[in-house]
């Protein structure tokens, strides 16, 4: 891998120190282009025809991200990584949630036909889109930058996106045993999905995560639970903590 970042090896060492609770990383959420000398002569693609192409056309996004990284600052510990996100919590879309492209983000709406069954369909178009996007970006990157892992999210947040937050909150009282079972099902699917996407984006064993622009010498994940602000400590320990720990 020959990236456009000239000090990548130094940055890797600082990340390894950081994973071992030493030192700091000087990074940023995304990238900036102002005053940057391009790393390569990569032309920008034609403007997206609409929001669907902007977010859901793998080839267009791969071309855009190739241009974007080539024209972005990679100083300090800023990583050369393509942001392949398909919305926050896109595991919910893989499981049946509905995509909606916005101007600045992707919204994921609940599955209108959700019936409390958590089923992974390997032929679901949203799952196929995830893989096609990563493969297109990996081919375009040609070793010049990492292809980031999308923001799949985990657990209760995924179910809230898939079913609706209000309904999930009611489930903590009305059907807690069913909710626990669903959390385990989501975890099991998460690991399957993550591993398959990791095998697409990995560089050796290394990977990068597009949100928070993080790097690791092996598998890593970002863990969170936004819905935890709306539940009790006891419910957090029952419905969130065990599955994040897993």
Where are these regions (language model features)?
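Active-site loop segments of alpha/beta catalytic cores
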Residues: 1-51, 63, 68, 75-83, ...
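Conserved active-site "lid/cap" helical segment
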Residues: 60
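A contiguous, low-structure linker/loop signature
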Residues: 81-116
């Amino acid at each position: 891998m020959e990236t456009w970042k000239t000090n990548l090896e130094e940055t890797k060492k600082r990340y390894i120190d950081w994973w071992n609770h030493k030192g700091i990383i000087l990074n940023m959420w995304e990238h900036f282009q102002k005053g940057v000398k391009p790393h390569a002569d990569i032309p920008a693609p034609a403007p997206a025809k609409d929001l669907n192409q902007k977010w859901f056309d793998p080839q267009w996004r791969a071309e855009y991200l190739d241009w974007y990284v080539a024209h972005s600052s990679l100083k300090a510990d800023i990583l050369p990584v393509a942001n392949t996100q398909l919305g926050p919590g896109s595991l919910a879309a893989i499981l049946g949630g509905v995509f909606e492209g916005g101007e600045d983000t992707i919204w994921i709406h609940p599955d209108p036909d959700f019936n409390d069954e958590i089923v992974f369909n390997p032929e679901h178009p949203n799952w196929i889109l995830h893989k096609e996007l990563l493969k297109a970006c990996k081919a375009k990157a040609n070793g010049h930058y990492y292809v980031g892992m999308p923001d799949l999210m985990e657990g209760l947040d995924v179910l809230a996106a898939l079913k609706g937050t209000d309904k999930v909150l009611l489930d903590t009282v009305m059907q807690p045993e069913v909710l626990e079972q669903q959390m385990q099902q989501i975890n099991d699917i998460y690991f399957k999905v993550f591993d398959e996407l990791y095998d697409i984006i990995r560089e050796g064993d290394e990977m990068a995560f597009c949100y928070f622009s993080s790097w690791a010498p092996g598998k890593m994940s970002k863990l969170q639970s936004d819905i935890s602000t709306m539940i009790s400590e006891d419910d957090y320990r029952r419905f969130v903590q065990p599955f994040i720990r897993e």
